[in-house]
Amino acid sequence: MFKNLNKKECPKRSKKERKLIFMKITLKDGSVKEVQKGISVLDLAKEISEGLARNATCAKVNGEVKDLRYNIEEDSEVEILTFDNSEDGKKAYWHTTSHIMAQAIKRIYGNSVKLTIGPAIANGFYYDFDVKENISSDDFEKIEAEMKKIIKEDLPIERYSLPREEAIKFMKEKGEDYKVELIEELPEGEEISFYKQGDFTDLCAGPHLMSTGKVKAVKILSSSGAYWRGDEHNKMLQRFYGISYPKASQLEDYLNMLEEAKKRDHKKLGKELELFMIAPEGPGFPFFLPKGMVLRNVLEDFWRDIHRKNGYVEIKTPMILNEELWHRSGHWDHYKENMYTTKIDGVDYGIKPMNCPGGMLVYKSKMHSYKDLPIRAGELGLVHRHEKSGELNGLFRVRCFTQDDAHIFCLPEQIESEIEGIMKLVDKVYKIFGFEYTVELSTRPEDSMGTDEQWNMAEGALKKVLKDMDMPYEINEGDGAFYGPKIDFHIKDSLGREWQCGTIQLDFQMPERFDLTYIGEDGEKHRPVMLHRVIFGSIERFIGVLIENYAGAFPTWLAPVQVKLLPIADAHKEYAEKVKEELEEVGIRVEVDARNEKIGYKIREAQLEKVPYMLVLGDKEKEAGTVGVRSRKDGDIGAMPIDEFIAKVVEEIDTYAK
């Protein structure tokens, strides 16, 4: 079917081969294959390796995700995707399982349920149904059994298209009103594709696996209410969440991780450890409690210190700014639905959803020379963004949060060195917290500002730095900001879950819109380039991630209470106060449990509070001037001179010990 192209000239072919039309396929590893025109992705995978073909779920053809059944008609770059080697590979697998679940539910409940949408998501899939009566979780087992039956049937999955009117008629005959609505809203000329497996057909763009039997281990996880299209004014639907894997052992590992994640839920631990609360009077607006404020302030102090050492200055911009500013920045046109607004003296104002426009005004407040650049201006800025009620989630999804923004204004020739500097800073910060991370490059979205030349230059600069730093990265097509491409950092927590936190965005648009200038060596005005970047992202969200990553047991330097003093009896309280003073003199955060309770009870309480160190103080310790040290991590360490204990804790704090 194909030959390796190891020479520039085409190889000699037989008469039969010369009648065929061949084309060149460039694979991910850079190797070039010569194949027959019109070959399917699946057949290409088989020619490469039977094992690859067995595990393949879809492919990227010239950057676009395609079915295995897709026929390649021209010279192309092709990457065969599997469940294990890419997110797109997982999504095809999970999207197919979503259809299997929908088919099972339709088989069981028939016309009493109507199909809406059922996409793959970050971890698994969901499908929303319009149901006459809510389906109980007691029925999950029955639905899973039907799913397994469909998988065992190994139904071929076929893709076909229909003209608009035929597609509408087809779905009307099936009574699928939501699908009719979706078809009617598709742009003229848009392909209307369907996927069929046995007695089930769904409107879908794909991609999907070749048959239902390719799915192996499945589980329905939960169900909840969800408004049609996320609009609270629409009908409430029932959403079913599920997960699937190629191996039963993978599913078992995932379910075990979910059980552990429940124990680490930041909403649960936030309440137990008295870190934060969400009041019904302020949905999406978190309240930080005293211990939570200690944690937050430690993080912000750490942020300020490390940025000062890396050449940043700190600014603070107002929360409410005139509507005209948001028109100038482009937010009013591209982001207004997420903004809160108000009127002052009859004039419209916007409550800032982002810090950047304020940063533009700070730069513009004085004239700059090329000698001043780069200027690195950081801001811990409180922003507000409207989120729908059903999407709010503890500290992970809120309506107000503090973003650790920085805006770097630089010369064009400084772009690459500044991006590299940011990446090194991000790496340093994440390593302190013990996070591994992956990198993703997000390219131009449909709703963007600027010229093709500007976007190509910006994307090229980001790619060059990633290449020069030997940084592996995935491309996320079309997910850049409206004003420029971006690099996203996804940290991995102790449960293996990924969280998108850090971002670097290259922006040629804002300096243009705000007429930012500097005086060059030639004495003329020039336009600076601007970089947006965050490391934590949202302080609130990052705290939520930390709570779950550490299961509330923060390392000593982060812990709201670092040491708990436990006097055994009233006679030891005075000594406890003396020890407290010595610890506080060097900045150690300490509390005394002076209650008239048994020492075992006090120890258990301190352990539940996840305090790193407990110091038991009795007659022996008082007479010897020592402390009885118990570590959250190592248990009973024994007696230790106060100075020695202080030195141990201070070293842990100063070195950000994990």
What residues fall within each predicted segment?
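NTP/phosphate- and nucleic-acid-binding module
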Residues: 18-116, 120-658
